[in-house]
Curated annotation (Swiss-Prot):
Biased composition annotated in UniProt, kind: Basic residues: 1-11
Organism: Clavispora lusitaniae (strain ATCC 42720) (Yeast)
Spans annotated as Disordered: 1-138, 273-292
Name of the gene encoding the protein in the UniProt record: UTP25
UniProt keyword terms in alphabetical order: Nucleus, Ribonucleoprotein, Ribosome biogenesis, rRNA processing
Protein name stated in the entry: U3 small nucleolar RNA-associated protein 25
Organism lineage string: Eukaryota, Fungi, Dikarya, Ascomycota, Saccharomycotina
Polar residues composition bias: residue spans: 27-36
Length: 693
């Protein structure tokens, strides 16, 4: 699946100066294609988008005109169109090339000037504000090499539960790595950041966030600063407590790494000086304090605006007086405006500012400055979108592929994971596949300083993975399930009750039907759902509905949508339209108009299209959900479609319904819709059909 765009690129001119050479299968358009990962019985037919007349293109409703406000947001809408005429204007072509570039990419080796600058700063006094033996950083990364090797042999075993707790509305579960317990040091639970966090970070954090931590923030900070893997679902888009915590954590990690290297440099320098004077005693120190390459932190984010906010937070907490390339960074990553106020609040927050998803930038910190657009091999922190990194990691030209800069990542942050799912989760898998691989080249690394567990290809066992999302999904949860951090992993699972679920907040007494089908495992549920729908649900729809028109079929998965549409075209005589994220604006406008006026009786509608456009569909009288939406807000918005028809007098609450097809493997999504108590009944009861109002 991809957000469609033109496959054409300007041809290279004779002198090669005016445009780029054409690259086969490269660019945002190719990389946004979601490859099929599971077998399908029905192949997806290739559809040709019908050409639309000018009058059809001008049929857009007033809502569409408001929708186009804001330059950055309009750029997002442009990506969703399938018809992109090629521009002949050279200036515009050059501009488009700049936009197609992965903003911030710099794969050159680190500059000599930067090395000289750091050598000057090495003379500065290194902060010594933490007890090494009581510091989670020192204990975690200073673990014995033999202990790491022993853990590596046991990672396929079961990870036992080490601790369970209930903090507010969250169930917190910590799993320990299998085998003998290694040396560990946990960060304290406190109302603010303190030791062992570096003083400069703690002071800057306190200045920006003076309020004491809530119990949830204390628990979250405890696990993050103890170097455990963390999976945290924030429940709502505006709950951003985790962002300030991981920003402080990655800065603390970078500064401690730098200070450790500088301290050991002094130790070696003093030894060699004593050796020259004939005063050296004992063997030469052999500190192991480095990886193959410099980058230690990778932060994955969905949009440039999200990256802008995180980088600004990092700069603010770093206390850097000098900020190199700050103006260029703001020009490429920041933008004003966004979606209109008529859109939901979470949607406006998601696509506010620059919503371009194509970027990758390096940040290099010294004691007095921060350099934006640093070389990837000289940066401390990499901030990127998965699609931006995939462009580099899997360049079609084998010789241009680069992944060495990910070899020594020690902290991985995946933020706004649900948005990344909607873009293309395959790119997250691509990044995870390349991270902590032994590099092809060694880029001037000092092997005498590289940690043995890195040389032994065990870096993944020490890497901390932090995943943050609005709601838990199987894809997001699997990142932590398959992580191998020997410090353990902690999950923060929000508990949804009947009082806090979406169903309880609708305010519309509408018939809500849930119908279960059987599936022995998640893999077989795809085919089982399709068979159940086409054999049991689809044939009975005309008998169950009280209206001849206004039936909306909502399909969460694009592959299921293509399969279902192909079946309905070839095996039924249903009068229906189908719109998805590939459809042109004219086609969407036409389909919506025909559906709202009753000329089309049935409309197929994908979850990803709703995510990116959040339409207010008119004429909806009944809804069938091919599967429960992962985002519970979508369920509420779908109900509102029917409520709109009821308000206009086109439908009646006693006759209209919303039916959800589900199996026991949809339990997490059901819990967010109807609460944990009802979800347990829906999945485990003998009955297969339930009705609520």
């Amino acid at each position: 699946m991809k957000r469609p765009g033109s496959n054409k690129r300007p041809a290279k001119s004779k002198d090669g100066a005016e445009s780029r050479p054409k690259r086969a299968n490269r660019g945002r358009q190719q990389l946004r294609t979601i490859t099929r990962t599971a077998r399908r019985d029905v192949d997806a037919p290739v559809e040709e988008t019908p050409e639309s007349s000018e009058s059809e293109a001008e049929e857009a409703a007033p809502e569409e005109k408001k929708f186009e406000q804001g330059k950055a947001y309009d750029a997002l809408l442009t990506l969703l169109q399938s018809e992109h005429p090629e521009k002949s204007d050279k200036k515009k072509t050059a501009s488009r090339h700049e936009e197609d570039d992965v903003a911030g990419v710099n794969l050159e080796e680190d500059d000599d000037d930067d090395d000289e600058e750091e050598e000057e700063e090495e003379n500065d006094e290194v902060e010594d504000d933490a007890n090494e033996h009581g510091d989670p950083f020192e204990v975690h990364f200073g673990v014995d090499d033999e202990a790491v090797a022993a853990k590596a042999a046991l990672l396929s075993a079961r990870w036992p539960v080490a601790h369970k707790a209930k903090v507010g509305a969250y169930a917190v579960t910590t799993h320990a790595s299998p085998g003998e317990k290694t040396a560990a040091c946990e960060a304290p639970r406190a109302q603010t950041l303190g030791a062992p966090v570096k003083k400069r970070v703690a002071d800057a954090f306190a200045a920006r966030h003076p309020a004491p931590f809530s119990p949830l923030e204390q628990e979250l900070a405890h696990h993050i600063f103890s170097y455990r893997d963390v999976l945290y679902a924030s429940r709502t888009y505006d709950n951003t407590v985790h962002r300030k915590l991981y920003a402080a954590h990655v800065l603390n990690h970078v500064f401690k790494t730098r200070d450790r290297v500088l301290k050991n440099n002094d130790v070696l320098k003093n030894y060699h000086s004593a050796q020259q004077q004939g005063k050296a005693t004992g063997p030469e120190p052999e500190p192991r304090d480095q990886g193959f390459t410099r980058p230690k932190v990778l932060i994955l984010l969905p949009t440039r605006n999200a990256a802008y906010e995180v980088v600004e937070q990092l700069i603010g907490m770093s206390g850097a007086a000098q900020q190199e390339n700050r103006r260029r960074f703001k020009a490429q990553f920041h933008a004003d405006g966004g979606p209109p106020d008529s859109k939901p609040a979470d949607f406006r927050a998601m696509f506010h500012g620059n919503s371009n998803d194509f970027f990758s930038i390096g940040l290099k910190f010294t004691r007095k400055s921060v350099k934006l657009y640093a070389s990837f091999y000289g940066a401390d922190i990499l901030v990127a979108s998965p699609i931006g990194l995939a462009m580099i990691l899997e360049d079609p030209k084998q010789a241009k592929r680069e992944y060495d800069f990910l070899s020594s990542i020690e902290v991985l942050v995946v933020d706004r994971a649900n948005e990344l799912e909607m873009q293309n989760w395959d790119h997250v898998h691509t990044v995870l596949r390349y991270i902590n691989k032994i590099p092809k080249d060694f880029h001037g690394a000092d092997f005498s300083r590289i940690r043995m567990w890195a040389i032994n290809d065990h870096a993944r066992l020490l890497r901390q993975t932090l995943v943050f999302c609005d709601f838990l999904t199987p894809s997001v949860s699997n990142v932590i399930t398959h992580s191998q951090n020997i410090a353990g992993k902690t999950r923060f699972r929000p508990e949804t009750t009947a009082q806090t679920c979406v169903m309880n907040s609708v305010g519309l007494r509408l018939k809500q039907i849930f119908q279960r089908f059987d599936a022995p495992d998640p893999q077989s549920s795809v085919d089982a759902r399709f068979r159940f729908f086409v054999n049991s649900v689809l044939p009975s729809l005309s008998k169950q509905t009280s209206y001849d028109d206004g039936l909306l079929i909502y399909v969460p998965s694009y592959f299921d949508y293509v399969r279902l549409k192909a079946h309905m075209k070839t095996h039924t005589k249903l009068d229906f339209s189908a719109i998805d994220e590939y459809s042109s604006r004219a086609k969407i406008t036409r389909a919506r108009h025909f559906f709202s006026t009753g000329k089309t009786k049935l409309l197929l509608y994908t979850e990803r299209l709703h995510h990116y456009r959040r339409f207010e569909l008119a004429g909806v009288k009944n809804i069938v959900l091919y599967g429960p939406p992962e985002n519970p807000l979508f369920y509420k918005e779908l109900l509102r479609f029917v409520g709109k028809s009821v308000f206009k007098g086109d439908a009646d609450t006693d006759l209209s319904f919303i039916k959800t097809i589900y199996c026991k493997w949809d339990a997490a999504a059901l819990e967010r819709i109807c609460g944990a108590e009802k979800a347990a009944v829906l999945c485990n009861s003998v009955n297969e059909m339930f009705e609520f109002r």
